[in-house]
């Protein structure tokens, strides 16, 4: 986006299960209002608490009517209020228990993995089966690792669900743990149940979330904005979500490009390298340094200096990684954003569509776990302060010629942001 407008583009691929099937017919880009210049892109999960997100968004759009807000952030707040006020309509209460189960089961899968990995590693080192005492140590250590993992997860601000989860689900959680980990001691069981109940107050969305990127203008917004939300679920009438990022065009920030969902290809285009490679460099080099130094005889170092050498090399590695990031921003990203700042609206839309296309090409030809997960028709829209939400490309599952009633029913509200019925589908 730049000072003139924000361009939104989304593909149509949706994955069923673990690559059991891929359909290229999903709708991911929507106008949030029939009148105001606001849109939203969805990604990751297509369902929220068992309800298709598309249905929720269209119900909200219908309920909004001609309502307008001063800022984009107020649209986001109003959407959340709509969800909480219509829990009966969407039957969220019926899906609370399956949602809670999905959260704590996903957490405890990590304990299973840690426990099994530790046993295999220890047996490989010892070249024999482990004794009961050795197993007990590994079991306790695995529980402690899970407790530490939970403790290190940042809290979700303003959320207090622990007492409700303890009162409603602690017995169920306790039964699940004792069934799957019959070896657990009473002391470890109590600590693990308590930690599991507290996970609902923390930023733990590993079981899945709905990605929502709200974009556009409030009445008092002169430049475009984007508010990027991860929405996990509703428990006891409270929303589990966090704001991933907020992007605004200002007098000093002239342009920005914000990849969503599968970001690796777009990051490579923008930076010359993607986050996963940078993180891998940051992990692998210190590990190689540690292994190499351990192989060097202690006599080559002055007394007490071996650890200092390793720490200094790790510091140099961290500095090198930061230097790579800065160079990528300077040599790759900055020239592109400088160009985006001056792009006319139609070129802005073409760039947004091209970002999806290059990712789609990569997913189509690369034989990896993500093959085919981006593809199908691309929906493209432009939102500007003066013209509002304008579709440039939009797929329909039906033929327009046979369904004129659809378009007439969607164009009953007249607005300066919209043209005639034939030119601007909502």
Language-model segments: what does each one mean?
Residues 1-426:
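N-terminal nucleophile
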């Amino acid at each position: 986006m730049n000072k003139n407008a924000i361009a939104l583009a989304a593909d149509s691929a949706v994955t069923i299960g673990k690559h059991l099937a891929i359909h290229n017919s999903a709708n991911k880009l929507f106008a949030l209002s029939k009148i105001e210049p606001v849109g939203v892109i969805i990604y990751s999960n297509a369902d929220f608490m068992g309800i298709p997100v598309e249905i929720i968004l269209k119900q909200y759009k219908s309920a909004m009517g001609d309502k307008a807000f001063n800022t984009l952030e107020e649209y986001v707040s109003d959407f959340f209020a709509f969800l909480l006020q219509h829990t009966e309509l969407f039957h969220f209460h019926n899906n609370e228990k399956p949602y809670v189960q999905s959260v704590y089961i996903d957490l405890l899968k990590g304990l299973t993995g840690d426990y099994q990995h530790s046993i295999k590693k220890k047996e490989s080192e010892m070249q024999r089966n482990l004794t009961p005492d050795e197993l007990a140590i590994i079991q306790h250590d695995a529980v402690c690792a899970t407790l530490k993992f939970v403790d290190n997860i940042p809290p979700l601000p303003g959320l207090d669900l622990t007492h409700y989860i303890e009162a409603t689900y602690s017995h169920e959680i306790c039964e699940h743990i004792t069934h799957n980990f019959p070896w657990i001691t009473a002391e470890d069981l109590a600590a693990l149940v308590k930690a599991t109940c507290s996970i609902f107050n923390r930023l733990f969305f590993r079981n899945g979330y709905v990605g929502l990127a709200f974009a556009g203008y409030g009445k008092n917004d002169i430049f475009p904005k984007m508010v990027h939300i991860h929405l996990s679920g509703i428990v006891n009438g409270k929303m589990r979500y966090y704001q991933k990022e907020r992007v605004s065009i200002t007098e000093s920030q002239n342009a920005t490009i914000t990849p969503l969902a599968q970001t690796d290809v777009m990051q490579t285009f923008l930076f010359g390298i993607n986050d996963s490679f940078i993180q891998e460099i940051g992990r692998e080099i210190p590990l190689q340094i540690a292994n190499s130094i351990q192989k060097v005889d202690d006599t080559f170092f002055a007394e007490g200096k071996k650890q200092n050498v390793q720490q200094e090399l790790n510091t140099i590695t961290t500095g090198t990684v930061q230097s790579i990031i800065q160079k990528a921003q300077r040599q790759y990203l900055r020239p592109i954003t400088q160009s985006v700042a001056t792009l006319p609206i139609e070129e802005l839309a073409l760039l947004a569509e091209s970002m999806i296309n290059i990712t789609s090409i990569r997913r189509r030809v690369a034989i990896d776990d993500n093959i085919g997960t981006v593809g199908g028709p691309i929906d493209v829209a432009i939102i500007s302060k003066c013209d509002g939400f304008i579709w440039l490309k939009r797929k329909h599952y039906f033929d327009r010629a046979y369904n004129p009633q659809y378009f007439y029913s969607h164009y009953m509200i007249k607005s300066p942001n919209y043209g005639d019925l034939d030119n601007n589908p909502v």
